[in-house]
């Protein structure tokens, strides 16, 4: 579906069918797609964050992507996305330090998804972004809520991210896209590692 849309359009906003969005979600997505259209290091716009850190402003960058409402550009996807067929193909060129970085030193064991057949697209995109030294824009407060997660196949804890609950209210105040450095924030990354600890 993503490739089909990007054959016809320069950008795409993706929503799963069990997602409820903030009233400011679409404005944020469209503004971010426009603002970073020429900043090719920015590869993904996320609507969900498992953090709640308004003290850091309205947005932040991280190498980690999230689904549940996201966007990207044709050039990023077409130039860099690979749907890997095997674990070996996905991890080609990466060393142990890279694997630890992707999995936040074991707090986010996402690479086990490479053993699935077929390999899910999201871990492929995560690795592609990392290999390109790309970053993903996130709001400091979530703009989406997954209203179907409690009935989902993989749901087994209402606090999958430790103290960061999925069912907290989403932000309704418009996002101001200020000119922040296009790089990860070490303090936020440390918080992210804690928030990802219980998600596998």
Task: State each model region's role.
Residues 1-14, 19-200:
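An acidic/histidine-cluster motif and surrounding catalytic segment
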């Amino acid at each position: 579906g993503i490739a089909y849309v990007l054959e016809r359009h320069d950008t795409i906003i993706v929503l799963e069918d069990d997602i409820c969005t903030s009233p400011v979600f679409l404005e944020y997505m469209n503004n971010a797609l426009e603002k970073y259209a020429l900043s090719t290091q920015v590869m993904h716009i996320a609507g969900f964050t498992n953090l709640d850190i308004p003290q850091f402003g309205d947005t932040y960058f991280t190498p980690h992507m999230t689904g549940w409402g996201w966007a990207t550009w044709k050039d990023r996807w077409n130039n860099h996305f690979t749907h890997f067929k095997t674990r070996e193909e996905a991890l080609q060129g990466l060393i142990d330090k890279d694997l630890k970085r992707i999995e936040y030193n074991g707090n986010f064991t996402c690479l086990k998804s490479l053993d699935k057949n077929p390999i899910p697209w999201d871990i492929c995109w995560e690795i592609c972004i990392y290999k390109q030294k790309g970053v993903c824009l996130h709001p400091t407060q979530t703009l989406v809520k997954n209203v179907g997660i409690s009935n989902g196949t993989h749901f087994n804890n209402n606090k999958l991210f430790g103290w960061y609950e999925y069912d907290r209210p989403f932000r309704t105040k418009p996002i101001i896209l200020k000119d922040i450095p296009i790089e990860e924030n070490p303090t936020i990354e440390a918080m992210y590692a804690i928030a990802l600890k219980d998600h596998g």
